[in-house]
Amino acid sequence: MCAQYLQTDQGPATDASKSDGAPMLTIDQIRTACDRSEPIVLADPMFARVDLPFKETFYPLGFPLEIETNSEDILIAMAESWHGFMKLFDTPPFRLSVCVQDSRSSDCPPMPSSRVQQHIASSVADSENFSITDIAQGCSSILLTRAAVAHQDYCRYFFLESAVLSMICTSYTTPIQAACVDLEGCGVLLCGDSGAGKSTLAYACAQAGWTYITDGASFVVNSRHDRLVVGNSNQACFRPAAQEFFQELSDKLVTKRVDVGKSSIELKTSSLRNIATSYISRVNHVVFLNRREVKRQELVRFPTEVARYFMLQRLYGLPDTLTVQSSMIDRVLGAGALELRYSSLDWAIERLGRLAVEGE
């Protein structure tokens, strides 16, 4: 009798991540093993038969996600990214598979390069660390080394969170590069380029009694009329310059974000007792920030066309989804956009408060 199962060249594969070590067998080797009724040692260079025994369901931004992996460290990392989120939206679950394999290097892999062609999104750091996402089917497959997983921030930011968010923002939401804060049920998007001060102003507003939603990535839920935004209020990320505004940041460690990124200070909002947080808000106003060479502090109209293209430029996906997202941006900008020119945080908070309460 000819037995057949997945194993390495050293024996049965108790860890599926080691299964690529067995070489392809010759016909003579297979014939000999069958004649002797010995197990056939099959190679799996494509990782097509890897066992992914660890399974769990998470709710990133409130959307259901089913994950399977051969590493408990992946589940720990996912829990770190999405703790606190419960099911908010009744949608078919996204699917994520993560295979972790051994590697010779213990170094953190390089920053991945990301590309999208039609319904396939890829993110490739090197030949051993990459992800492939089918945005049409809502499924993603990730292959990582143990070295990559050991650098948890890198693994979470560039692969686990990136794959999940790419599915969410090409199906059920419209992503906008904006912080979001809420005062008495009035949500305000704080827009701007990187370094515009979105995180700083959002955090300052939260200290002044606003509800903190997110510091830089807002997701408008598609096909709704109430301009509902969902964000990750579990964390805030600042540039080192923010230490001059907030005393509590003065003793925080400045690190290279996710091992290869920009210098930053990362803060978990759960450690702050004086900050109110929420995952959702209904947006009433869109405000672009301008704190460069301000001669007069004021809130003025901002060109709607400029605001629209600023939001459109980050979108990718299938044509039908892009059509929906374009209409959602038009809905968010239904009342136009504003520009907040300021040099004082206190003045900016007071002026935004007036906008939220009085509508002007």
What is each stretch, according to the model?
Residues 2-6, 21-194, 207-211, 218-360:
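A noncatalytic interaction/capping subdomain that flanks phosphate/NTP-handling catalytic cores
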Residues 201-202:
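Post-Walker A alpha-helix
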Residues 198:
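Conserved lysine of the Walker
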